[in-house]
A protein has these predicted regions:
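Bateman/CBS regulatory modules and CBS-like beta-alpha motifs in cytosolic regions of diverse proteins
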Residues: 28-44, 51-53, 82-120, 127-129, ...
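Short beta-strand/loop segments at the ligand-binding rim of alpha/beta enzyme cores
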Residues: 43-50, 96-101, 160, 216-226, ...
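Catalytic cores of alpha/beta
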Residues: 60-63, 235-243, 282-300, 340, ...
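Short beta->alpha transition motifs characteristic of CBS
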Residues: 74-79, 122, 126, 133-149, ...
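Catalytic beta/alpha-barrel core
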Residues: 73-77, 103-104, 124-126, 164-166, ...
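Glycine-rich phosphate-binding active-site loops on the catalytic face of alpha/beta enzymes
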Residues: 67-82, 245-257, 296-314, 344-378
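Alpha/beta catalytic cores of nucleotide-metabolism and tRNA/nucleoside-modifying enzymes
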Residues: 1-24, 104-105, 166, 176, ...
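Active-site-adjacent beta->alpha loops and helix N-cap segments on the catalytic face
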Residues: 30, 79-88, 146-150, 194-214, ...
Length: 491
């Protein structure tokens, strides 16, 4: 028996190997429905997720992508307290009603109030007594010209004729109250004047500006966070849950392993209300294994990322489009979504990834260059770039991602075996601009396929193409004089 017949079980295809075949269409791109599932219980308004990488997703980017309708996954290359604070920052960025507002106790000093305003980046704080009952509110306006930092806030706060409302007040009524009284913050109290929340003009305005934002039932932006399989995993999980995280992502290089499932089962047993995404995998067998263990979504991609070297260092992986399709077939009927992670270069790749069976895509390099990403800004040859590195790069592993590659027991940096590189990507401007182009391309693809929604896109057909077909697909036989905002062949 030949080697191919005996050991080669499949032909692996990726994005450049295929094109979607256009179909009869009655749908315009602007009218397609982009809603999808991130995990079993979390709905997205666009099928886009930012990667749990330390040069991609921290609070600033997570806030920005949630406002556009996607979700960000805060990376774990930081202390437990820092990651929990990042989650809290996202959860406090927007609210229908703030259920746990920052408060200050009466008797505190002006200096204390100013410090809290600076720490939480807020312009006003409700003042409460020891029992949590509202006694006043102190704002920037009250403190603007105050020179005595030791003066009690009781003397400067607004305490007469306080405008408050009850918990049953809806946002439209709250907006009218704020406008009528020309105030920006509306304390919410119970029948005994105990503070139970806060409604702000800023949050109402943000909700109107971004109606498709990904939010929880309390009107707060959704956010996920990455965790590993290491000695302090459950301490980290507990802190993230306390911080209000919407989903946990067990982020490893090889999700089809006993250690990962052991962690998954423990998390689901302890926190059954928190969705748990597990990855990364590349086969249908792995998907079934994780679903049986309780996964609320699976993340697909072994080595397709631009900064990943797993396939050449370990010799392991499955070309991404085939991996997505294989896992999608295994997930049929389970209700468990598939997140396609890695290998995306253009918006057309996103269309292909979803058409092959994905529910959403996870983006690293496509978002690493935006101004909201935490990567360092670099000027090189007169052009602006941002740093971008794989979580399997030596630099990232030294900072804390060793456990992702099952090397957390290794302290000697010389004995680490990296599966990624450090790089740079061109600066791209704001996340909004990038997402706008990605979503626009995705809508166009759905229109060409005649798909009203993502479920219909899953029925689209592909054609396999040659290298000549790939060359023909790109601009050719011309010199590009001005780049489009959604197309580039590299630096």
């Amino acid at each position: 028996m030949s080697f191919i017949a005996d050991r080669v079980v499949m032909d692996g295809l990726t994005f450049d190997d295929v094109l979607l075949i256009p179909a009869y269409s009655e749908v315009l791109p602007r009218n397609v429905d982009l809603t999808t599932k991130f995990s079993r219980n979390i709905t997205l308004n666009i099928p886009m997720v930012s990667a749990a990488m330390d040069t991609v997703t921290e609070a600033k980017l997570a806030i920005a992508i949630a406002r556009e309708g996607g979700i960000g996954v805060i990376h774990k290359n930081m202390t437990i307290a820092e990651q929990a604070k990042q989650v809290q920052t996202v959860k406090r960025a927007e609210n229908g009603m703030i259920y746990d507002p920052v408060t200050i106790t009466k008797g505190k000093r002006v200096a204390d109030a100013l410090a809290m305003m600076a720490e939480y980046k807020i312009g006003g704080i409700p003042v409460v007594d020891e029992g949590g009952y509202l006694v006043g509110i102190v704002t920037n306006r009250d403190l603007r010209f105050e020179k005595d930092m030791n003066r009690s806030i009781d003397e400067v706060m607004t305490k007469e004729n306080l405008v408050v409302t009850g918990q049953s007040t809806d946002m439209e009524a709250a907006a009218q109250i704020l406008q009528e009284h020309k105030i920006e913050k509306l304390p919410v109290v119970d029948s005994h004047n105990k503070l139970i929340g806060l409604i702000t003009y800023k949050d109402i305005t943000k909700a109107k500006d971004k109606p498709k934002a990904c939010k929880d039932s309390k009107g707060r932006l959704r956010v996920a966070a990455g965790v590993g399989v290491t000695f302090n995993t459950f301490e980290r999980v507990a802190a993230l849950v306390d911080a209000g995280v919407d989903a946990l992502v067990i982020d490893t290089a090889h999700g089809h392993s006993k250690g990962v499932v052991d962690v998954l089962k423990q998390i689901k047993a302890q926190y059954p209300h928190i969705d748990c995404v597990v990855g990364n995998i590349a086969t249908g067998e792995a998907a079934k294994y994780l679903v049986e263990a309780g996964a609320d979504a699976v993340k697909v991609g072994i080595g397709p990322g631009s900064i990943c070297t797993t396939r050449v260092i370990a010799g392991v992986g499955v070309p991404q489009l085939s991996a997505i399709y294989d896992v999608a077939k295994a997930l049929e009927g389970t209700g468990v979504p598939l997140i396609a992670d890695g290998g995306l270069r253009y918006s057309g790749d996103i269309v292909k990834a979803i058409a092959a069976g994905g529910s959403s895509v996870m983006m690293g390099s496509l978002l690493a260059g935006v101004e909201e990403s935490p990567g360092d800004t670099i000027i090189f040859n007169g052009r602006k770039f941002k740093s971008y590195r794989g979580m399997g790069s030596l630099e990232a592993m030294q900072k804390g991602s060793k456990d992702r590659y099952f090397q957390d027991v290794e302290d000697d940096v010389k004995k680490l075996v990296p599966e990624g590189i450090a790089a740079r990507v061109p600066f791209k401007g704001s996340l909004y601009e990038v997402i706008y182009q990605m979503v626009g391309g995705f809508r166009a693809g759905m229109g060409y396929c005649g798909a009203h929604n993502i479920e219909e896109l899953h029925k689209a057909r592909f054609t396999r193409i040659t290298n000549a077909g790939v060359q023909e697909s790109h601009p050719h036989d011309v010199a590009i004089t001005q780049e489009a905002p959604n197309y580039s062949r590299g630096e």
